[in-house]
Amino acid sequence: MIRYIILLVYFLIFEVNSQLDCSKAPTPAIRIMCNQIQRWDQKARATPSLSGDVKTPGIAGKAMAAEFSPIASNVFQCMDIACLCVFFRGTGGNNCVVQGRPLGKVVRKEYRMLSDDERQRLHQAFRTLKQNGEYDRLARVHAQYSESGAAHSGPAFLPWHREFVKRMEFLIRQVDPSLHLPYWDSSLDQNLPDSKDSILWTNEFMGDANGEVNNGPFRSWKTVENKPAITRAVGAQGKGYSEDEINTMLGQTDIAQVLAFSAPQRGCPYQPNFNVPEYTHGNPHIYVGGDMLETSTAANDPIFWMHHSFVDLLWEMYRQSKQTRATRETAYPADNRQCSSEHHFRAAFMRPFTPMRNADGLSNMYTDNLYSYAPRPSCNAGPTCGSPYLFCDKSHGAPRCAVRMKPEGNCASFKNGEDACYQGSCQSGKCVAGSQNVTPPPTIQPTKPVVTVEVFSETCLKIRLKFFQTSCFNENECCGPWSAKGECQKNPVYMNVWCKASCRQCTPNYNINEECSDRHTNCAMWSRSGECNKNPLWMSENCRSSCQKCGRSRAATCGGGGGADSISNPTTMPPATNNGQQNTPCDSPMCYNEDQCCPIWAQRGQCRSNPGYMTCQCKVSCGVCRPNYVYGPCADYHYDCAAWARRGECLKNKWMPENCRRSCNTCVNQQQLAARCATRIVRSAFLELIRMK
C-alpha cells in the first residue's frame, strides 16, 4: 500500500511540474500520443537509470576506466559485416559468404518496392521468428518502460529505435542473409482519397484492416499478451505521414527539435512542440490502431518494424542533409532533468542494450557498414513509380506516388489516365476487379535458419549459434577477485553491468574458475588482429590463452583494493582542453562534474577516448553516477553555493561555474558553452606552442 501511495504522490507532483498540456494538441490523434508520451515519462522517471554512484573497484597503481571494450561478445553488438560474418559462421570478412549465400550491407527498400519473391521470403522469415519465439522476445522489449526508459519521451527516441530495428533486421538475416527490413512509407497510402482502400490491407501484404487479423501472412498470430490474433482498426483515427510533416522535420536547424524533448517539465527551456518527430511518428501508429495504438502492444504487429524503418530513414535524410559527418556523431541536446528523464541523457545506458549508451545510436557505422536506404518512390521512375503496386498520381497537384487500390476503392478523382486500381479498372468511380483475381500468397517451405536460438531467460536475448556461443562475459580480468571480496554486494551498480558472469547476472557456458582458457570462439582470431593490445581489459579476462596471460593469475594482477575514489596515482592525461595540466587525484566522493566544459568534452567523445580523467572529473556527463539534484537547469546544485560565491570562489574554483550556475551567474546555452570551451582549446594550444619555443 505504501508503494502505491508513493507512486500516486509522484504522479501528482509530475502533473504539477509538467508544462505539457495535452489538451492543446492540434488533433485528437496527437492528443492520444501526447498522453502516451507523458505516461511513459512518468513511469521512466520513477525508475531511474542508475540507483547510485558507479564506483569502480580499484587496482593498486592503476586508474580504472569504467568503459566497455569495443569487442562484440554477441551478434547484436556487431556494427559491421565482418563481425556478423563471424557470428553467422561465414567466410570472407566484409565480403562474407554464409552457406553459399552472400551476407553484405543491405539496401532497405519501400515495402511495395520488393519483388514478389522478396516479399514472400520476408513474410516467411517473420513467421519463422514467430514460431521459434525470437519475434516475441524482442517485441516485449518495447513494452518495458522500466527496462527501456529511453525508448520514448525524449531525445534518445530516434537512436534507441535505430538500434531496436537493427536487431530485428539481424534476426531476419539469421533466417535469410539476403533479406533486409523494408520501410513502410505511409504517405503513399495517405495520398489516396481513402487510405483504407490501399492494397496494403490485402492477403498479399499485411492482411485484415479491421478487427482480428485472420487473413494474410500474419493471420492468427498470438500476441505476447496471449491474445489469439493481432488487432487493427485502420483509419478509425490518425493518418499516415504527410509531406508537410516530413518537410518540417527535414527543415529543422536545431538538433533539439529532432532529438527532441517531447515531455518537458516546468523550467525546461524548450517549449512543447507537437511537430517534433516523436509526435508525428505517432500518427501512423494511431492510424493502424488495434495493437499499434498502444506503446506496450505496438510491436506485436509486423508493420511496426517497417514503420520504424521509415522513421529511421527520415532521420537519416536529416542527418545527411543538415549535418556534417562529425556532427552526426556528436550533436545531442544538453542533459537536463527538467526536460527529460535521466534515461535520455547522452551518456546514459541505452537499456536494455547495454553496454551501449544513447550516444552510440548516433554512430555513422550503422549506415556506413550495415544498411543504407533506397530513395523513396518517385514519379521519375515512370507511371508505376517503379513498382506494380504503385502509380503516379497526376490529378492532385504536383505528380506524386501513391499505392494502388483494391476492389471498391474510390478512384473517382483520378482524371489523368492513372492506373490506380490493382488488377482491375476504374468504373463509375470505383475500382472493379478484372479477370485476374487476387489470390492468397503461395505456400512456401520454411527457410532453414542460418543460426538456431536457445532461450536463457525471459528478459534478455541470447543467441545460440551452430558452434554455440554465449554472451555472458565479464568486461575486466579483475571481476573474479572483486567478486570474491564481496564487490557484487557492496557495489552492485558497477559490478552487475561490468562483471555479469562473476556476479551471476547470467549463466556462462564455460568454466568461470579456469585460470587459463579462451572463453570465446573468436579469441585466436582477435589475438592475431592485435586485440590483446587494443582491448587489454576484455581480452585479458576472456582470451587469456590466446593473449598469453596464463603466467600471472588474476588475483596477482588485481591485488590492492579500495574504490576508484581512492586512486592516488592516476596516469591518464586529462583532455587536451584542460589547459595541458596533468590529471589530479579522483578524490571527490560526490556526483558532480568538476568543470563547466564537461558536457562539451563528453559530446566530443572524451568519455571514451580519455576515460581515466573523464570518469573522475566529469561523472555526470559520462553517466558514471546519478546526481541527487536536478541536473541541467540554471540553478545552484549545492546549498552552500551562495556563501561560496560571496567569498569569491566563482573565480578561484573551476567547480563553481558548473555547479553554482545561479550564484556565479554562469548560465549559458549549449552553443555558448561550446564556444567558451573551444576558446579554452585555442588558448591551451597557444600556451603549448609558447612552451615549445
Swiss-Prot record:
Binds 2 copper ions per subunit. Residues 472-506, 516-550, 591-625, 634-667 form the ShKT domain. Disulfide bonds join C472-C506, C479-C499, C488-C503, C516-C550, C523-C543, C532-C547, C591-C625, C598-C618, C607-C622, C634-C667, C641-C660, C650-C664. It comes from the Eukaryota. InterPro entries: Di-copper_centre_dom_sf (IPR008922), ShKT_dom (IPR003582), Tyrosinase/Hemocyanin (IPR050316), Tyrosinase_Cu-bd (IPR002227). SUPFAM superfamilies: Di-copper centre-containing domain. This is Putative tyrosinase-like protein tyr-3. The gene is tyr-3.
